[in-house]
Structures are given as C-alpha cells and as structure tokens.
Amino acid sequence: MWIGWIELDIRLGDVHSLKTKRSIVRPIVTELRRRFQVTAAETAHLDKHRRAGIGASIVAADRAHVVEVLDAIEQLIAYHPEVEVLAARRHMVTADD
C-alpha cells in the first residue's frame, strides 16, 4: 500500500477579499475530490487574500498510480488561469515504512 500527498503553495490573481479567494479555492478543492477521488483541503495561508495552500492525499495499491494522480493534481491546478503555483511538495510512503 502506498500513501502519497502533495502540498501546493499558490498565488491568486486579482483577489482583494477572503470571500473572493474562497470562491476560487473551494471549486478547485471540490474538483480535486470529485475528479481524482482524493482527500483535499485548503491547508495554508487561510488569512491571506492572494495566497493559498492546497493539500491532497491518496492511498493506492501501487506506486505508479499514486505518482500518476499526484502529477494530474499538480497539472490541474497549474492550468487554472487565476492561480500561479509557487511551490509543490510531494511525499510518498509505503505501509512498510
């Protein structure tokens, strides 16, 4: 069993309120959950207007699937025109670790 997670630090475009920020971040998190069947949440910079942290995790039987899903998550977020990915950190462990 493999457990993988990704943490993305993103900058939002022309955002001037937390309400506007949430209107951008929440649909992204919802899309990650729906499309990839992962656990996802806004995890950092909760009080900043133009920054956000998004985390997602997956458990799978093989490493290749975990890598594939984490790649797809990073690409999906990077393709959103209103966000810029500043950093992406990945971690993977096996149940034997």
Each PLM stretch: what is its role?
Residues D9, E42-L46, V67-A72:
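A general secondary-structure boundary signal
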Residues A41-D62:
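Short, charge-patterned binding micro-sites
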Residues V38-T43, L86-A87:
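A short linear hydrophobic-aromatic micro-motif
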Residues I6-I10, I54-A56, A88-R90:
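A structural signal for short, well-ordered beta-strand segments
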Residues A60-D97:
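C-terminal structural segments of small proteins and small subunits
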Residues M1-T39:
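N-terminal first-folded block
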